[in-house]
From Swiss-Prot:
Identification of the protein by name: Ribosomal RNA small subunit methyltransferase C
Primary location class: cytoplasm
Matches recorded under Gene3D superfamilies: Vaccinia Virus protein VP39
InterPro entries xref list: DNA_methylase_N6_adenine_CS, Mtase_sm_N, rRNA_ssu_MeTfrase_C, RsmC/RlmG, SAM-dependent_MTases_sf, Small_mtfrase_dom
Organism: Pseudomonas putida (strain W619)
Catalysis performed (reactions): guanosine(1207) in 16S rRNA + S-adenosyl-L-methionine = N(2)-methylguanosine(1207) in 16S rRNA + S-adenosyl-L-homocysteine + H(+)
Compartments in which it is found: Cytoplasm
Family in the record: Belongs to the methyltransferase superfamily. RsmC family.
Entries under HAMAP family matching the protein: 16SrRNA_methyltr_C
Amino acid sequence: MDPRSEVLLRQADLFQGPLLIAGAPADDLLGQLPKANAWTWHAGDQAMLDARFAGRSHYGVDVPPVAFEAAVLFLPKSRELAAYLLNALASRLGGGELYLVGEKRGGIEGAAKHLQALGKPRKLDSARHCQLWQVTVDNAPEAKPLESLAERFALELEDGPLQVVSLPGVFSHGRLDRGTALLLKHLDNLPVGHVLDFGCGAGVLGATVKRRYPQSRVTMLDVDAFAVAASRLTLAANKLEGEVISGDGIDAAPGDLSLILSNPPFHTGVHTNYQASENLLKKSGQHLRKGGEMRLVANSFLRYQPLIEGALGNCRTCAEADGFRIYQATR
């Protein structure tokens, strides 16, 4: 069980009424708290929770339409996302109890200071390198629309500026990361057809390809509901058409692809997690059509080339700069 869940269950008597658990991990916490519902923005966690606790877990970027008298927020990595979630929950909890739980190395002590605007916070417990905080919401705020927290910026590309819309919690929120910047310089001679932007984030790669290769069909895939929402906003801001889907890894992707583009993720919250990236590399051949191509950027220290060669039988380095490499392989 997640150590944060274990800290909550040390105070289980507090959580026996109608409860919403935001950012709930895919463990047995709902099994221990029968009147609780979960809200998650991670498609993989949603699939696991829904399989075990059907109808009690809700996926998306908005507070789910369920009744609750108290709420727990599992602190996310992003400060901007934490602020959005605290506001969204507190706006529904006038006079109710809001709890915040997180790891010390994830910044729980600093995040708990944001509870002061809502009432008088107090630390209830500290164990398993985690802390649990509580506040009675005396000053319920007005809910802020998610789009009001969007960061908008323009990327100057060869074929003109691309408008990017990023949301709290999305990778490299409000700016272009170095890996994607390098890959954007090496998008020439791409195969035309069905293109997948894997781990799409704010949709930079997918939108760029759709504009440059308008005859291609673009599908964008991410595990995070906020990334899915941001990618849709980026497409709309540039008057482009594309399909944006949520799913946990390459298994959720369509088949018969002409191209897979990616700056694959290797973090889950504050933890390193290579599983999604390694599955992409190992299973790419199952989703590419014959002659289809995979082109991705990754940190130079990651040993991805042997995995790509094992899956597709070939791999070459197209470019290397700023600690990143671009790999290209063909099925």
